[in-house]
Amino acid sequence: MNICIIGGRLQGTEACYLAKACGMKSILIDIDPEVPAGGLADRFAAGDLVKEDPAVIEAFRSADIILPANENDELLAKICELAERYGKPLAFDPEAYEITKSKIKSDRLFIENGIPCPKYYPDGRLPYVMKPSDGSGSTGVKKISTEEELSEALKNKAEGDIIQEYLEGPSYSIEVIGIPGNYRTYTITEVHVDKGYDCYMITSPVELPE
């Protein structure tokens, strides 16, 4: 099976590695010819998919299934359009993505289903963390440890920013994959982060605390 992975940074690198481990042939598309996943893919087409560069359209059409590995809204919309145009199965749900990319929407879903999540200011107590509702990779995240920092953060808070309790401890992740009526969870992984690279390593198996 040929899988077309669109996006060659962290997510795309993981996808190319796992595709190879599963015996699948990976076709990578990215506008940047120097992305890290380029060396892992069986085939790499560098070009602008949004502008429908001929080389990347040909690569797209040669795949059996399409896997977006990016968080660019314009590019994701184009991927959905092209998948429908060329009749390609798409491993992506736009409606689910609209929830998961928004911390406000995903927290609302957790609360509605009785799943604990950090309290929003003014509930809870210091330390807090201020971050954009959308986005990932710790971009725009600021830890608030004192009343003075909280006062300053409230004055500079941008539209769409949220302030929540800061939770100490390890970070875990679990994947859910499926189609309507048939979903399953996979192994729990631990996400390792540092100040220089944000997420620099994912490990499994994980021993969860009681």
Can you describe what each PLM-predicted range is?
Residues M1-F92:
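ATP-binding N-terminal substructure of ATP-dependent carboxylate-amine bond-forming enzymes
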Residues I3, I66, Y128-M130, D161:
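Generic beta-sheet signal
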Residues S26-I29, C117, Y128, D161:
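Hydrophobic anchor at the start of a short beta-strand
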Residues P33-A37, A96-T100, V193-K195:
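Short gly/pro/ser/thr-enriched loop/turn and capping motifs at secondary-structure boundaries
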Residues E58-A63, G124, K157-A158:
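Glycine-rich phosphate-binding loop signature in dinucleotide/nucleotide-binding domains
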Residues E84-E152:
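A conserved helix-loop-beta module that forms one wall/lid of the active-site cleft
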Residues E165-S171, E175-E210:
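ATP-dependent carboxylate/phosphate-activation module, predominantly the ATP-grasp catalytic core
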